[in-house]
Amino acid sequence: MITDQNSKPQQGELPTTHIDALTNSFSQFLRIEATSGAVLLLATVVALTLSNSPWSDGFRSLWETPIGIQIGAFQFLRSLRDLINDGLMTLFFFIVALEIKREVVLGELRNPRMVALSVVAAAGGMLVPMGLYLALQHGQPGQHGWGVVMPTDTAFVIGCLALLGSRVPPGLRVFLLSLAVVDDLAAILVVAVGYSRSIDWTALALGAVGLVIIRGMALLGVRNIRVYFLAGAIIWLAVNASGIHATIVGVILGLMTPTAGWVSDQRLGEILRKVLSYPPGDHWSGDTEDNRALQVAGIAVRETLSPVERLEAMLHPWVAFGVMPLFALANAGVPITIKGLINPVSLAVMAGFVLGKPIGVTAFAWLGVRTGVAIRPAGLTWGGLVGGALLTGIGFTMALFIAGQAFQDATLNAAKLGILAASVVSSVAGLTLLCALPRSDGTLDADFH
């Protein structure tokens, strides 16, 4: 039996035990966005090391291991890499969609004037790199990879900002997070529209029916998360069979997730007041009215949080420290050769990220501010914005994902090398500039106004 005899809780707090000190620290560790970037970096280094070692053939073969099930005439067989890219990454896109909806409904994206700068800058950060890439690859085999240079990797960008600590103004952090959200949404649309196979409309219709059923369950008040995950898995199978990239299921379900809790704040207060009205004593055990009141209070506390917030808190650590490192291990491994680095596709990818991203983000942000469409957040100087724009050249996770849809074999390896090289150059350039700027940077203001 767990006791709280050694705990010294403050008034209004839950009692603690020795294990809580460890688990709470670990929970805080998991919640730090920068830590997931460090884990992702470690997985990338491991993948690159093994891919350029005597064990490279075995490492490559591992991800091609076929895995699947067969029930009668139904057969589902995929390589381990495909299961990660098409299956587990659906959870990643689900989390991205939850983040987008939370920010739009509850967060920084609620204020149109505040978000306008990020939207305009994100547009420039996608259009300019894409245009530069197409200019370099027009009529070439790599032309189909125009979507590779569009995204920004949130985890790595936040990880870089964490290295700078208090030198990073809150305005820059909000700007980059909002920009990354817009980037992610656009990248999702690119995958769904630009890199899908021929469509099986029957399978797609079955997937659409599944979404209608999920909507109906929500309207009826079904709150069992397991039921929704089971329905989501069935929809995923249908959409996967349709030819449209199945990760779009994660996006749609994430955007369909409610942002309002089932129990209102007022109702929660009433329920808690009822529980607190009981006099002290040993009357919480057994099948009693008091016990049922306590159970109702527990449910009310949980259901006051919106499904978006609960699912994000529940799944984000698993995605950040499980799915994304697995994705990096399965996809970031590529033989590093001079021939690969000077491949036209690799050079076009590097140009798009290292040059196109910062130029597009900075130029469009400046135009947005000068035309009055957008305003800069307090504390975000032009010098800081340029430094942040350099960091947006870190495409990594989404860029590798899109490259896997656009290319095969040697061209895919060249694109991966370009993505990795661009991520290194962009992170070093961005960190160097942000470190060089004074805390109250006004040096670039005169040049932009």
Swiss-Prot record:
An annotated Gene Ontology molecular function: sodium:proton antiporter activity
Listed name of the protein: Na(+)/H(+) antiporter NhaA 2
Reactions it catalyzes: Na(+)(in) + 2 H(+)(out) = Na(+)(out) + 2 H(+)(in)
Family listed: Belongs to the NhaA Na(+)/H(+) (TC 2.A.33) antiporter family.
Cell compartments where the protein resides: Cell inner membrane
Keywords linked to the UniProt accession: Antiport, Cell inner membrane, Cell membrane, Ion transport, Membrane, Plasmid, Sodium, Sodium transport, Transmembrane, Transmembrane helix, Transport
Topological type in the membrane: Multi-pass membrane protein
Encoding gene per record: nhaA2
Functional summary from the UniProt entry: Na(+)/H(+) antiporter that extrudes sodium in exchange for external protons.
Residues spanning the signal sequence: none
A GO CC term assigned to this protein in UniProt: plasma membrane
Transmembrane residue ranges: 32-52, 87-107, 114-134, 145-165, 174-194, 202-222, 233-253, 318-338, 347-367, 382-402, 417-437
Keyword flag Cell inner membrane: yes
Gene Ontology BP term (one): regulation of pH
